[in-house]
């Protein structure tokens, strides 16, 4: 029996790049460099903990029962997945809504600088990656929103660094068009002096300029600017250690 293409499952998971013409393994790459305030005590204990929570902003209230026991689809916001990374004297909270999946989280610290990277993992590295259609990929680029909230942390527990290498997204880092991906950005200036933050979304298997976008945010010496970071030179990725 031939199943019409429209009814076939659009998100097939695969551990290697798909051969299909209209399918794309979309990934996201988030790089952040935080310079702490001069008087902040040095803390090089990276990857102290990583917490992941997924929540929908409008979870239906269990006390209120609808007449036919069904929840209207229109009422439910897309779920947001939050990652809270504690290390280097900071608690970095990242929120992702309608974005590619994060499968790799890493950190490094050098003096008063703490770097972090959250990314998808390209197929062929032992992690499944869904293949989606071009239309779904274009919608993801338009809809994906990343929020960030950086607080001071006095956590003292030891680093929990994983021994495996840091896996990456394999998204090409050429100049691409800007898209408004970064949503709210909150920093605690008690411990954060400067912040540079870059986000890229793209096809992890083939270069496709229409499916590759980036956004950036800079907070330096008390003033904020958007879209200004050159993510290729932002941090030394070879120094990163895997937190998950």
From Swiss-Prot:
Reported induction: Expressed in the early phase of the viral replicative cycle.
Acidic residues composition bias: residue spans: 54-77
Chief subcellular location: host cell
One Pfam family of this chain: Orthopox_35kD
Biased composition (Polar residues): 37-53
Region (Disordered): 1-79
Keywords: Early protein, Host cytoplasm
Gene Ontology CC annotations of this record: host cell cytoplasm
Domain of life of the native organism: Viruses
Job of this protein: The protein is truncated in this vaccinal strain and presumably inactive, because the lack of signal peptide prevents the protein of being secreted. In the other strains inhibits host immune defense by binding to host chemokines. Binds host CC chemokines (beta chemokines) such as RANTES with high affinity, but not CXC or C chemokines (alpha and gamma chemokines).
Similarity field: Belongs to the orthopoxvirus OPG001 family.
Protein name in the entry: Inactive chemokine-binding protein
Species name: Vaccinia virus (strain Copenhagen) (VACV)
């Amino acid at each position: 029996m031939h199943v019409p293409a429209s009814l076939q499952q659009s998100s097939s998971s695969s551990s290697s790049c798909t051969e299909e013409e209209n399918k794309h393994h979309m990934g996201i790459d988030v790089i952040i460099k935080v310079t702490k305030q001069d008087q902040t005590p040095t803390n090089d204990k990276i990857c102290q903990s990583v917490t992941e929570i997924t929540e929908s902003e409008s979870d239906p209230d269990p006390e209120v029962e609808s007449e036919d026991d069904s929840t209207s689809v229109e009422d439910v916001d897309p779920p947001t997945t939050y990652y809270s990374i504690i290390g280097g004297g900071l608690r970095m909270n990242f929120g992702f809504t309608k974005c590619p999946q994060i499968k790799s989280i890493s950190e490094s610290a050098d003096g008063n600088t703490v770097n972090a990277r959250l990314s998808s993992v390209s197929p062929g590295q032992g992690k499944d990656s869904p293949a989606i259609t071009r239309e779904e990929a274009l919608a993801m680029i338009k809809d994906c929103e990343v929020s960030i909230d950086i607080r001071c942390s006095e956590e003292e527990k030891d680093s929990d660094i994983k021994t495996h290498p840091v896996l990456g997204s394999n998204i090409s880092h050429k100049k691409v068009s800007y898209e408004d991906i970064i949503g709210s950005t909150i920093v605690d200036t008690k411990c954060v002096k400067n912040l540079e933050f870059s986000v890229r979304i793209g096809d992890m298997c083939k270069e496709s300029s229409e499916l590759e976008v980036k956004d950036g945010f800079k907070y330096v010496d008390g003033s904020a600017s958007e879209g200004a970071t050159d993510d290729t030179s932002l941090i030394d990725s070879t120094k990163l250690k895997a937190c998950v």
